[in-house]
Amino acid sequence: MKKRYFILFLCCVSWFTGRSAVTDSARIEHHATWKNWQKETAWQNPAIHGLSLTLPYSEVYVQMDYLHQSAPFVLQKGTGHFLSEAKAETFLRLSNHSSAWGAASYMTGKQYQVSWNSSSDYDLLNPYILADTLGGDTHCERYGFQGGYAVSKGKFQLGIEAIFRAEHEFRNVDPRMRGIVTDLTLRLGTAYDFGKYQWAAGLEGNVYKQTNDVDFYRELGVIPEFQMTGLGTEYSRFSGDKRTLYYKGGGYGINLDANPLNETGFYGHAKLWRRQYKRMLADLNSVPLTQLFYHSAEVSFGWKHMGGTRQVALDGNLVFVRRSGDENIIGKSSAQYYPITGKLTMYKNYLIDTYLRGLYGWGSGSGTWCLNGKIGYWSNRERYVYPERKMEAAKIYGRLGGQWMRSLSRTVALTVDMAAAYYGNVSSGIVMPYANMKASFQDMINHQYQFEKADYGMLSAKIRSDYRLSGSQIGLFAELGGDWITCSENEHQHHLHLALGITF
């Protein structure tokens, strides 16, 4: 019953906040590539995000997402998924000086043939996960909420935003993993108009928690669960039958932005953030086993012209992430107390993504088109200190995309997106103490390296049709998209996406 009420709530969120019928200009403002060029950078500041859009727009829709890989590119993520979601999104311009936006969603689905991972949020917590060699299909449920508000007074702008996620992932056959996640992010931003530029600063804070356990119900016995520590290593003292743990962490970040007030000129973005996550063993009085640290820096600088009917943008970007992991040295227990006698920084990981991207387009109130491209260098280096283990790969990549949006009549509009990309490996290497590794761990590491150093090619397409009901505030839309990825290891991935909904 709770799910039914929640889905009903999604369908009503935007209905009672809609103020005007959807126009072509509103559809373009919220979906055009060039209008959302800085969505992943400057729009992380809610003061910029809330006042960058001018027209009210809401969507309520259901969507389905299917992905299949002929062999898992990442064992810990499985061979694909089937997900269905109900979602409502709205943006309201409350006045010339204020705006509010929000979203609510419910997702459910299944992930296929997951192995070497019994924890949720693998991308975030890797390598400090609970894992076994058997695995299986996992089910998931996710609730998401987001809300923000921005206001301007004179030359000052202020914004605030909250993003919340609650997720439950589980398996109903042995090994019966379960992960329950709560994740809350708060953002506060401010901006000031000075000279020909808007100067902005923002703060971000995150709180994260996950409870994680694995159970066995069948009489055939149990298999060991490994407390993984990176590149095929485990904390052997606490592996085996210790299967209940939890993660606790979060962090903070700061971002700075400069944007031309007339939408023509140089712009820049910088962000620094730090996060950390503790893994604690609930079976042994919550003794902390490991701690994972993130330190990241993002820098972007470019020039744009977004005024009038022609749009041009070019920028250079650098993303650097350093991850390091501490393993606690735990003494002998005394009355269920496990003293920490020291710690060692054993795992190190360096990620670099630097790229140049550009856009050229044309737009008006009834239609728009644009071409966008991206070329870059990506590098991932991992190291485990002792016994020494190393894995690294570097790629050069390029992507070319295009978008066409047009009103075919007073009631029908069409949007088409297409893209092609290629990731080519330029260097790779691995160092492993294979003589001292279990056969199953060798196979897992070799599979990881095989797909990390592979070349990838991608083709994608998406088409969306909008129909505006005559004399009504409501519009209907249908969207169909997909992509095809080929891998130099003679494997492939296909992905399909379908969405149906209403706009107002």
Model-assigned labels for residue ranges:
Residues S20-Y112:
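N-terminal, post-signal peptide beta-strand-biased segments of exported outer-membrane/organellar beta-barrel
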Residues S25-A26, H492-F504:
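Outer-membrane beta-barrel "beta-signal"
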Residues T54-V60, N96-G102, G154-I160, G195-A201, ...:
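Outer-envelope beta-barrel architecture signal
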Residues M64-S70, Y106-K110, V151-K155, F164-H168, ...:
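Transmembrane beta-strands of outer-membrane beta-barrel pores
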Residues S70-K77, Q113-S119, F170-R178, N212-E219, ...:
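Outer-membrane beta-barrel translocator domains and adjoining extracellular loop/strand segments
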Residues A86-L92, F145-V151, L186-Y192, I254-P260, ...:
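Residues on the lipid-exposed face of transmembrane beta-strands in outer-membrane beta-barrel proteins
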Residues T233-G373:
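Long, internal scaffold/assembly segments composed of regular secondary structure
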